[in-house]
């Protein structure tokens, strides 16, 4: 680990938390927001459109990171993040609102790629693994706080959740004060891209990692798209109750991510990812078959474990198996697949039938992904 202050670490973790809230912070108050903005399209789009923005702009950001460096890219991401997120409730025109949410996704991917590049440059080996685990915890803890606060504020006034985006401004001040402005020279990475065999291995290992990234976030975000409408209808939840329920998933993910280094040391990284998808399958299976709220909370625990064992670990695999010159590009692709998964979750609303079919289909897909990844990793051990 390079010389880095505690304030720098705190800054990295706080800024990381912004990536989870880009769409989800308004989720608990989504019915009220859709009604007041007179949004004519599928309600879930307001949550997932930033994800589509990430997908569109990720290739550009992946190239910019090598030209601008993480510090400049991060600063240029935080400013529009605050502005575009905040002005959402002013935009009564549906098409302007759609453009705003798409551009918010561009700001988000700039933040994610820049902050992960900082981690790659400032930390090495076990320290890097630990920091990525902490980053996963920070992201999910942000989910806990922002969903809870978003639900609470949404009950007071439908516009209040949009004010949370302004947190990017004090975080920008912390970035200016604590993070290095110049690129940091790195020691030779595990994969340098100098050897053709290593290049081939990198390409081969990245394919399932990117696929796993897509499905892990798509599966996770099914809850964000379906639960805001399902819980009030089935269990008479208020907006704040919905926010607390959904934030519980993130809380479990935080606790799981905190143990990720210990778990991977015992089971191995690739097996741990497969197990994470099995937990997803069990969680959504319970969501689909039960009408009891306490069983729903068991599903919350299982789903949270699934997320905590997949997305942070897949992020680590991208950093670990990327050469220095290809890391920015691979992180851009990772962001693209993660947020493409978020956007894809929108389309579960078009599955025929009620929420039962959505949850069961999600559980089945989770199982298939776990099996596929296990077979691939076994063959390429």
Identify the residue ranges that each predicted region occupies.
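Juxtamembrane intracellular "pre-TM" segments in multi-pass secondary transporters
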Residues: 2, 180-209
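Central cavity-lining transmembrane alpha-helices of secondary-active solute carriers
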Residues: 48-62, 247-259
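Conserved MFS/SLC helix-loop-helix module at the cytosolic interface between two early adjacent transmembrane helices
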Residues: 56-93
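Helix-to-loop junctions at the C-terminal end of transmembrane segments
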Residues: 58-69, 256-268, 353
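Paired small-residue
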Residues: 95-103, 283, 294-302
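Cytoplasmic helix-loop-helix junction between adjacent transmembrane helices
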Residues: 100-139
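Helix-loop-helix hairpin linking two adjacent transmembrane segments in secondary transporters
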Residues: 134-177
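A late C-terminal transmembrane helix in Major Facilitator Superfamily
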Residues: 319-356, 362
């Amino acid at each position: 680990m390079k010389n880095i202050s505690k304030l720098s670490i705190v800054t990295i973790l706080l800024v990381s938390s912004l990536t989870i809230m880009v769409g989800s912070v308004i989720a608990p108050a989504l019915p009220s927001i859709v009604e007041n903005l007179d949004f004519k399209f599928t309600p879930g789009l307001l949550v997932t459109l930033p994800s589509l923005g990430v997908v569109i702009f990720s290739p550009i950001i992946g190239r910019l990171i090598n030209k601008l460096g993480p510090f400049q890219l991060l600063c240029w991401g935080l400013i529009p993040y605050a502005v575009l997120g905040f002005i959402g409730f002013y935009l009564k025109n549906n098409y302007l609102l759609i453009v705003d949410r798409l551009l918010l996704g561009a700001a988000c991917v700039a933040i994610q790629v820049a902050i992960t590049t900082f981690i790659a440059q400032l930390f090495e080996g076990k320290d890097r693994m630990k920091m990525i685990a902490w980053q996963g915890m920070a992201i999910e803890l942000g989910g806990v706080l922002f969903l809870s606060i978003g639900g609470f504020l949404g009950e007071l006034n439908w516009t209040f959740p949009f004010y949370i985006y302004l947190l990017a401004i004090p975080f920008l001040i912390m970035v200016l004060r604590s993070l290095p402005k110049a690129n940091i020279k790195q020691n030779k990475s595990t994969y340098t891209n100098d050897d053709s065999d290593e290049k081939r291995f990198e390409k081969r290992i990245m394919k399932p990692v990117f696929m796993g990234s897509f499905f892990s976030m798509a599966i996770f975000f099914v809850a964000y798209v379906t639960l805001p409408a399902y819980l009030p209808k089935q269990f008479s939840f208020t907006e704040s109750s919905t926010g607390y329920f959904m934030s519980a998933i993130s809380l479990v993910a935080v606790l799981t991510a905190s143990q990720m280094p210990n778990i991977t040391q015992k089971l191995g990284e690739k097996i741990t990812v497969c197990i994470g998808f099995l937990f997803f399958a069990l969680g959504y299976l319970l969501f689909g078959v039960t009408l009891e709220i306490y069983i729903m909370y068991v599903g919350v625990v299982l789903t949270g474990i699934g997320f905590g064992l997949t997305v942070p670990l897949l992020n680590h695999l991208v950093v670990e198996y990327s050469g220095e010159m290809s890391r920015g590009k691979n992180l851009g692709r990772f962001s693209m697949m993660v947020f493409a998964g978020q956007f894809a979750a929108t389309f579960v609303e078009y599955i025929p039938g009620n929420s039962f079919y959505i949850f069961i289909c999600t559980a089945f897909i989770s199982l298939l992904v776990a099996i596929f990844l296990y077979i691939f990793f076994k063959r390429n051990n």
